[in-house]
Amino acid sequence: MTADDRIKLEPSWKEALRAEFDQPYMSELREFLRQEHAAGKEIYPPGPMIFNALNSTPLDKVKVVILGQDPYHGPGQAHGLCFSVQPGVPAPPSLVNIYKELKRDLNIDIPNHGYLQSWAEQGVLMLNTTMTVERANAASHAGKGWQFFTDRIIEVVSEHQPHLVFLLWGAHAQSKQKLIDATKHLVLTSVHPSPLSAYRGFLGCGHFSRTNKYLEQNGETPIEWRLPPL
């Protein structure tokens, strides 16, 4: 499998990740997904949306990286951006807590939807470290090869340009810290925004205002975290 026209991938990412498509793990991952589909399993997000994080945020446009774990596994939720859901789908509990922190931190009213596409289009790379999942089976595709691909994405972003902000929420995201050059970038960590942990430090972390302050200090336009209405 090579990075050719069969893979709908934004050109800067296709070039930066070209070698990954020739790696043995990618062949194994492709075969695993083929077998899952052949067995009649429903896989999320839908095929054209798997690389939405990369296609929405070209490499040269990345300012902020938010790491998630794996896609939502309910019907109609996942569309390739971590924490985000498709229009018309209620915001899941972790995203509700993200909104609560935005309200506390920047006084941004909580929106009536969970579609974070506008963040991606401003330069927020919203990357799940496992990019697919079986319906109603959380973490079912963990350890199948995506981790090698997304580790390389994190390394490429860290190497490519200085003065990015990495938001690492929870132990899984923080396990990727070793891939990031902290001398070039701002790395902000907290517990996960899940209702199980958000009260232990996510609510009150101030990550959104701190992100924008760092971007402005380094000559970048801040992120407009306020989502447009749908």
Swiss-Prot record:
Any Pfam family matching the protein: UDG
Listed PROSITE patterns: U_DNA_GLYCOSYLASE
Keywords for the protein's UniProt record, in alphabetical order: Cytoplasm, DNA damage, DNA repair, Hydrolase
Positions of the catalytic residues: 70
Main localization, broad class: cytoplasm
GO molecular function, one term: uracil DNA N-glycosylase activity
Family that this chain belongs to: Belongs to the uracil-DNA glycosylase (UDG) superfamily. UNG family.
Protein name as annotated: Uracil-DNA glycosylase
Organism: Pseudomonas fluorescens (strain ATCC BAA-477 / NRRL B-23932 / Pf-5)
Gene behind the chain: ung
